[in-house]
Amino acid sequence: MANLLKTVVTGCSCPLLSNLGSCKGLRVKKDFLRTFYTHQELWCKAPVKPGIPYKQLTVGVPKEIFQNEKRVALSPAGVQNLVKQGFNVVVESGAGEASKFSDDHYRVAGAQIQGAKEVLASDLVVKVRAPMVNPTLGVHEADLLKTSGTLISFIYPAQNPELLNKLSQRKTTVLAMDQVPRVTIAQGYDALSSMANIAGYKAVVLAANHFGRFFTGQITAAGKVPPAKILIVGGGVAGLASAGAAKSMGAIVRGFDTRAAALEQFKSLGAEPLEVDLKESGEGQGGYAKEMSKEFIEAEMKLFAQQCKEVDILISTALIPGKKAPVLFNKEMIESMKEGSVVVDLAAEAGGNFETTKPGELYIHKGITHIGYTDLPSRMATQASTLYSNNITKLLKAISPDKDNFYFDVKDDFDFGTMGHVIRGTVVMKDGKVIFPAPTPKNIPQGAPVKQKTVAELEAEKAATITPFRKTMSTASAYTAGLTGILGLGIAAPNLAFSQMVTTFGLAGIVGYHTVWGVTPALHSPLMSVTNAISGLTAVGGLALMGGHLYPSTTSQGLAALAAFISSVNIAGGFLVTQRMLDMFKRPTDPPEYNYLYLLPAGTFVGGYLAALYSGYNIEQIMYLGSGLCCVGALAGLSTQGTARLGNALGMIGVAGGLAATLGVLKPGPELLAQMSGAMALGGTIGLTIAKRIQISDLPQLVAAFHSLVGLAAVLTCIAEYIIEYPHFATDAAANLTKIVAYLGTYIGGVTFSGSLIAYGKLQGLLKSAPLLLPGRHLLNAGLLAASVGGIIPFMVDPSFTTGITCLGSVSALSAVMGVTLTAAIGGADMPVVITVLNSYSGWALCAEGFLLNNNLLTIVGALIGSSGAILSYIMCVAMNRSLANVILGGYGTTSTAGGKPMEISGTHTEINLDNAIDMIREANSIIITPGYGLCAAKAQYPIADLVKMLTEQGKKVRFGIHPVAGRMPGQLNVLLAEAGVPYDIVLEMDEINHDFPDTDLVLVIGANDTVNSAAQEDPNSIIAGMPVLEVWKSKQVIVMKRSLGVGYAAVDNPIFYKPNTAMLLGDAKKTCDALQAKVRESYQK
């Protein structure tokens, strides 16, 4: 029994029981029970993690001893990453000298410098070349490895069975960098591709060095120089790198490959893809082309023979895994080339693609320079070592993602393209046992993968299905419906005044439509602010209905006074905020301004009217026309930076003239005038105070709050007008029209009022920005709409005052509730559309007042504002590829979303620190910054502006790319950057800058996610499919500054985080921007 108990307890994973086997039976029971009752938490202890803690492991970086090998396995930056992960790192003295990395660099990075024997005895050894005999020590490097240690290096196991035998004797675990599977998830640690990229670039540089002419064509005074013609055979990594380098140097580049996808890549780089007449796919496994048929090879040879007579430089990269390189160019072809031509054989190490190649040598054969070097990556040792180091550090992090322990599991059962595939393919020996080659993975794609159609291609196919007849019929039907509606309005018109008002409304809408389209996107925020101020003309309605003496004497007069007071807040506050924003766009180099001179036309307009009124002239309609034209001019003035301040001045003149004309029509007595003046003065003072104190970053919520005032003023005016006009309904032929307009204006005003308050609460942080998705909200909204529409029936049928005022009160409440339910269901990121829609609503509410009071000015201005908001809403929706109904009803997905399973994102991301980011910024000549709402939230515009100023002074080309919906209202980011002093001429819109990304060295993405998400173009099943985005991933390097890798508002993973040219700089945007600014300043001062 004791032996049985000993067996049980020693086999138990709980440390509590591991030492009980030697105890006597009774004592065992007593201690067991006591321990159980006093240390119960140990029974719930988590299982011990597998592997060895990083801090107990040492990574060794020996010096490469292969002849002419200048690379080193780890750069100082790589050492720093491993030390940060927890490893101890030792580097052989002088290991990085040939790569321009001194021992001091490694010490600063956290490594210790030791001798060759000590380094090779490390737990984990990383090398470039496979272990070989060390001539200095007189011993094979494999014999110096630690027993049961780990080696990471290029191994080529199929060609080196003797080396595997030596490593097996040391019970070594070997990861062969040359065996990393060429699958998407492994791109970051594909060392063969990294080295091939360098070889391809170096091949062009060497060819240019030995070629006797310019690559680019030139016309000089001495004569014309034709461009060099280059043929590149093989569209793999090396071939494409060669094509890119040669094209950038101005040569005419031609590319050949047996794979259609590779030819497409040649074409995308600007090279001319060459094909043979015979159609045969060359798609093979592992990223290589397959061997072709005899007929295809004969056609290929014919093409090559023809090209040899035309081109100046030949670069060939064709390899077949595990076999001798195919001879593609025989001696006769080479000798047919022009004297002075150059051939570069990147397959020389495997025998070469040219019959005349001498591996490892440079020589001239009958005037043709042959470059057959087999160590091209080593000839760019610094760059090659850096990339190889990145490959190794990423591989280690990927195979052992645990934060504390180093551990990876090698399994023979794995799926294609997974991390298990990468580990099993890379590990060629486990604890001394050779496990190469890896077994075949499961779920291998059969043949060439079918290329998924892009969103643009699907949209083009969809457009092609619409026949010209159907398209024309759709247009004709729309015009037919519109003209029929106009005829219906004419028939239903109760009098001539209504027809004239409809005419005014229609013409004003057309003028507003064309005027607003001319406004530059950078000025959309000032546009909304000035329309907010102009919408304060609801004060006209309030003034027209005010009465009494020093105080209102009836309910309707009180409502009117309140409407005038509220509207005055909008007028004064709106114009002041607009002026503040426009002042921020001023540049130090701009000429002086004399805006006070606009007092001259203002004084002439208002003073002239007062003089005419005193002389007995009734020119109020002309005043309304002039005021309306000034309001049109206000919107038109905002089309450019140069006329924006004139636009704001015209808006003030228009509103002042309209108010003056209204007072002239009313001719109030002294006491009533005092009441009007007091209400407007108080409201204006409050508006000026708010506008003066508001921070520009809080502009969206201010606009939303001002919208609510317009909506409330419209409701009050409509109800007051009903109360005042009710006694005349029995004798007024237009009574029904007045009632309909009053009801409609009350409904629109109620929705605008409550919806704006909810938008304000979300933007101000008083309410959660996340959408409030009430159960059955669509049915609820439909019920509220039906009740609101149904309320007009008793309102129109029953002539009693009680029924009428009850219906107006009910629709006010119903519309207010509907405004809450609609806006609450919309998330914070959709606020740009919400604000523009509310802006449009306020315009239509103003139009309703114009019809109600038969006032041309209100109708004109309302149509301008309504069309302005509608156009901005349309622009925002187009920028998200969503319908307005989708946004307003709290929906998700774009109009292009296919609805299938979204694309799976694979791969690993690359994280960098501030020093790495500074190095990338320092090396870049052209930089684009793409800010998002994260910049607004963090208020990081000031350090970014200072950073841009310093970089510009260093001669770098720095610009901003702004997405239309990057912020919480249109143009918000433009205003924030202007506030920080960024010149507006370097702040470009998405459509203006998207075509520049491919030529940009570096993009800084600050606090943006969905607006730079490549899934919008790459994944037809994404919910943001078809959404126009900033194409930052097309640039050479991208740094994404975010708090985490989390999703954006659309809850869609962003593939750019995992692209090979993207680096993640994680952290708080404000702190990161401050740190970047400080680091650049420090570097700048040096």
Curated annotation (Swiss-Prot):
GO terms for cellular component: membrane; mitochondrial inner membrane; mitochondrion; respiratory chain complex. The modification N6-acetyllysine is found at K70, K397. The chain crosses the membrane at residues 475-493, 501-521, 527-546, 558-578, 596-616, 622-642, 646-666, 672-691, 702-722, 740-760, 778-797, 801-819, 833-853, 857-879. InterPro entries: Ala_DH/PNT_CS2, AlaDH/PNT_CS1, AlaDH/PNT_N, AlaDH/PNT_NAD(H)-bd, DHS-like_NAD/FAD-binding_dom, NAD(P)-bd_dom_sf, NADP_transhyd_a, NADP_transhyd_a_C. The keyword Chloroplast does not apply. SMART domains: AlaDh_PNT_C (SM01002), AlaDh_PNT_N (SM01003). The modification N6-succinyllysine is found at K117, K224, K294, K331, K1079. Residues 1-43 form a transit peptide. NAD(+) binds at R182, V183, T184, V237, D257, T258, R259, G287, E300, L319. Keywords: Acetylation, Disease variant, Membrane, Mitochondrion, Mitochondrion inner membrane, NAD, NADP, Nucleotide-binding, Transit peptide, Translocase, Transmembrane, Transmembrane helix. Residues 723-739 are cytoplasmic. It is a multi-pass membrane protein. NADP(+) binds at residues 933, 965-970, 1007-1011, 1026-1027, 1042-1049, 1068-1069. Residues 44-474, 579-595, 880-1086 are mitochondrial matrix. Its main location: mitochondrion. It is found in: Mitochondrion inner membrane. It catalyses: NAD(+) + NADPH + H(+)(in) = NADH + NADP(+) + H(+)(out). It is linked to Glucocorticoid deficiency 4 with or without mineralocorticoid deficiency: A form of glucocorticoid deficiency, a rare autosomal recessive disorder characterized by resistance to ACTH action on the adrenal cortex, adrenal insufficiency and an inability of the adrenal cortex to produce cortisol. It usually presents in the neonatal period or in early childhood with episodes of hypoglycemia and other symptoms related to cortisol deficiency, including failure to thrive, recurrent illnesses or infections, convulsions, and shock. PANTHER family: NAD(P) TRANSHYDROGENASE, NAD(P) TRANSHYDROGENASE, MITOCHONDRIAL. Homodimer. The transhydrogenation between NADH and NADP is coupled to respiration and ATP hydrolysis and functions as a proton pump across the membrane. May play a role in reactive oxygen species (ROS) detoxification in the adrenal gland. In the N-terminal section; belongs to the AlaDH/PNT family. In the C-terminal section; belongs to the PNT beta subunit family. This is NAD(P) transhydrogenase, mitochondrial. It comes from Homo sapiens. The gene is NNT.
